[in-house]
């Protein structure tokens, strides 16, 4: 029983570390995208936003992906793209 608990704690620690790495990667990408958008001319920025939103609209998610997850992704992309304009 102690071995099982120790193994589960070890796996949990691994997952937590992987989660931290993934969060750091996402935050780094968010910083890069925001900086790039802020340094673009307004018309270029809007064209890129329109292209990304258009591509996102055309994508048909796999049926196995819950609608809530798809909507969460779409909302986050919109937030990320609109943030530099504020």
From Swiss-Prot:
Interacts with RssB. One of its GO terms (cellular component) is cytoplasm. InterPro entries: SigmaS_Anti-adapt_IraP. It is found in: Cytoplasm. The keyword Cytoplasm applies. This is Anti-adapter protein IraP. It comes from the Bacteria. Residues 1-36 form a coiled coil. Belongs to the IraP family. GO terms for biological process: cellular response to starvation. Its main location: cytoplasm. Inhibits RpoS proteolysis by regulating RssB activity, thereby increasing the stability of the sigma stress factor RpoS especially during phosphate starvation, but also in stationary phase and during nitrogen starvation. Its effect on RpoS stability is due to its interaction with RssB, which probably blocks the interaction of RssB with RpoS, and the consequent delivery of the RssB-RpoS complex to the ClpXP protein degradation pathway.
């Amino acid at each position: 029983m102690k071995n099982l608990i120790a193994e589960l704690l070890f796996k949990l620690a691994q997952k937590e570390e992987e989660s931290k790495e993934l969060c750091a990667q996402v935050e780094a990408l968010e910083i890069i995208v925001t900086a790039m958008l802020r340094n673009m001319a307004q018309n270029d920025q809007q064209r890129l936003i329109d292209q990304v939103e258009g591509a996102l609209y055309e994508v048909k998610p796999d049926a196995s992906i819950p609608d809530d997850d798809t909507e969460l992704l779409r909302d986050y992309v919109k937030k990320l793209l609109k943030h530099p304009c504020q």
